[in-house]
Amino acid sequence: MKVLALRHSVAQVYADTQTYLHDDSKDEYENAFLISNLTAHNILYLNYSLKTLKILNKSGIAAVETQSPDELFALIRCNFTYDYENNIVYLHDYSYYTNNEIRTDQHWITKTDIIDYLLPGWKLTYVGYNGKNTRGHYNFSFSCQNAATDDDIIVEYIYSNELDFQNFMLRKIKERMTTSLPIARLSNRVFRDKLFPSIANMHKRVINVGPRNESMFTFLNFPTIKQFSNGAYIVKHTIKLKQEKWLGKRVSQFDIGQYKNMLNVVTTIYYYYNLYHSKPIIYMLGSAPSYWIYNVKQYSDFTFETWDPVDTPYSTTHHKELFFDKDVMKLKDDSVLYIDIRTDRKNMDWKEWRKVVEQQTVSNLNIAYNYLSTGKAKVCCVKLTAMDLELPITAKLLHHPTTEVRSEFYAILDVWDIITIKRFIPKGVFYAFINNITTENVFIQPPFKLKASPTDYIVALYALSNDFNSRQDVINLINKQKQSLITVRINNTFKDEPKVNFKNIYDWTFLPTDFELKDSVITSYDGCLGMFGLSLSLSSKPTGNNHLFIINGTDKYYKLDQYANHMGISRRSHQIRFSESATSYSGYIFRDLSNNNFNLIGTNVENSVSGHVYNALIYYRYNYAFDLKRWIYLHSIGKVAVEGGRYYEHAPIELIYACRSAREFAILQDDLTVLRYANEIEGYINKVYSITYADDPNYFIGITFNNIPYEYDVKVPHLTLGVLFISDNMIDEVVAVLKEMKTELFKTEISTSYNYMLFDNVYVANASGVLSTYFKLYNMFYRNHITFGQSRMFIPHITLSFSNKRTIRIESTRLKINSIYLRKIRGETVFDMSE
């Protein structure tokens, strides 16, 4: 959903669009709630309130103020991520395909021959980090840039087994045009760029678990963040390899050597960060022209000092000369050294060339060892070739993708490696490594151990659900970690599957009820975005690879109606009820009937079940941005801080009734996951509320009326407003509650329109308009620790006779209350009051 705010209506009609006119009779929160439950994707919001827009954005729903038709058209034609704190719109708009254009934010790609392999007549455009260079295309009242690129396709091609780039690109563009937009993945870079500066500013010690290549630039500005990944491939792991020969396989049609060099250097930087927690100077020998340096500098400020006879235009300092072993003394401490020296083959035959390469490999290693043997805080990444060689058993081997699989690979060495044991590795083993292993991640830090760390803030995005982790250990970590942002895969299956397939692995699945948390928010991706200054124009799909975002130790926990709130809680219900259901009242009718309340007159205004909890359960796949457990808990302890809107405090029994309705809904739909979720939420309600039942009551509250429009043969027809189980010394407390509620009780608009047999030999009249007052009275008694109400549904009725009679219908008749009293069952009246 996206909300586009306008001061004036527009003549143009757009598909999947509704118009909402601000209702001045309601406050900003109520207007926001009504907007959030509209069913169209595009909402044109007229006569808007800025506060309402802010409320929607904090809820994760993109709401943007537009000042011109051009702005409206730009936003209505595509999806986007909105930085509402800085008023920046990041479009995810691929309409540039209509210009026969693909886009990249990787500068090095523009310096390759990729254009020879594009679709006929197509071009490549560099758009800068997150499309920053496109800002000039949009002369808008808000900052706007198109973050859409085709880098995901290019990178997927590089790591694939396919060689024909044009066919690969064509297939992927067609897939993009025929499948739903993966909005979470596209907006994730924007999210990370907001998230980590925020966390790093507030917490000195930050742990990040499971970063992948898409985050390779995000963390360049955060050397103190401790990374955990899947670990490095080290020399001693090669013992498992069988010897092979040179393969000579082409990986990419266009030259990706610069990409390989960039990955090597970035891998080395992060390895350095994990050791020394600061930014190094970056020395590079060879690898000119290194256009990729421009990319790195767009994200973070580094000093690059380079040696190569060929120009390196983006280096900070370039020495247009060769580097020799004696020059090592020029290199300072607190640095990384990338050695990529390789003489051009020119016209040498392969045997002579092989000798030169092996000599250079030995020379490169000597430079590396000399560099690491003196000074402090140093890491080296060195180019090697497959040959009989001794290497430290702890050296980290790299084989990032390059244009052709030939003989080269790289090793990362630190100051400890050069003093450790070395092992002789034959050439064939290195070929086996090169032929079969591709380094897929620039983060090669050791794996994370699933243990809470009280002094750290842990971030684990899409990293812990894999089934090689113990599911219970993941739950324990989340329960015990005081400060964290951790995601786990949501169980949105229908058969309550404990794990589901994802690519070539399996993920554990989770529901919010799997965790026992306080001061934590459990929400969706868009709900989480709202907490960090972002909002989204497109929610996650209800099925597929979706995640719960669990934020521990957030200062937004008590801001119940601002973050992870009830916005959109009824949207799916509206979509169903106003399109394919038997009646738009279907939800109300089902909730009453499933709790054995057969009086459906006015069911849409006087329902016996919490619609919030019911919708949050049966449609949780659509609206899990709403943190139901937090909502229940804060109500149970009386700490609900509400800024605005129509606030109705539910009685705990209403929540129980909702769970029962949801359970029956799940059984009818054969939805085993909702069935378990409803059962567990009911258990949670009973845990946090101290609910007691007057199933063996000794007192009741009765209401008598001045006018009963039916014949009756009981002595005094009355409405039982509830039963109690109390000791005699609690009578004064009950009376005090009744006196406090007196005005509201007598203002209750009770009406009747038919009579019926409640049980055999119990003839009663219906009583409408009672439930709202009953639940308020229930809450009053609950807060005063007085047992009121039974475990079964309260059905308001007036007993007329203890004999069997036929149903009679009349025009709805208002009943005038005569008196309200407290009486002992089979005893005397102990309190009576009249208006």
Curated annotation (Swiss-Prot):
Gene Ontology process terms (BP): symbiont-mediated suppression of host innate immune response; viral process
Note one Pfam family from the annotation: Rotavirus_VP3
Region (2'-O-methyltransferase activity) residue ranges read 246-428
Primary location: virion
Annotated spans, GTase/RTPase activity: 556-692
Signal peptide boundaries: none
Q: Which organism is it from?
A: Rotavirus A (strain RVA/Human/Japan/KU/1995/G1P1A[8])
**UniProt note: domains:** Contains a bipartite N7-methyltransferase domain, a 2'-O-methyltransferase domain and a GTase/RTPase domain. The C-terminus contains a phosphodiesterase domain that degrades the 5'-triphosphorylated, 2'-5' linked adenylate oligomers produced by the host cell in response to IFN stimulation.
What's the domain of life for this entry?
Viruses
Give the Enzyme Commission number. 3.1.4.-, 2.7.7.50, 2.1.1.56
Name any one GO molecular function: mRNA guanylyltransferase activity
PROSITE patterns reported for this sequence: SAM_MT56_VP3
Free-text function comment from the UniProt entry: Multifunctional enzyme involved in mRNA capping. Catalyzes the formation of the 5' cap structure on the viral plus-strand transcripts. Specifically binds to GTP and displays guanylyltransferase and methyltransferase activities. Has affinity for ssRNA but not for dsRNA. Capping activity is non-specific and caps RNAs that initiate with either a G or an A residue. Together with VP1 polymerase, forms a VP1-VP3 complex positioned near the channels situated at each of the five-fold vertices of the core. Counteracts the host innate immune response thanks to its phosphodiesterase that degrades the 5'-triphosphorylated, 2'-5' linked adenylate oligomers produced by the host cell IFN-inducible 2',5'-oligoadenylate synthetase (OAS). The host RNaseL is therefore not activated.
Q: Does the keyword Cytoplasm apply?
A: no
- Extract the ranges annotated as region (N7-methyltransferase activity): 171-245, 429-555
Its annotated compartments are:
Virion
Protein known as: Protein VP3
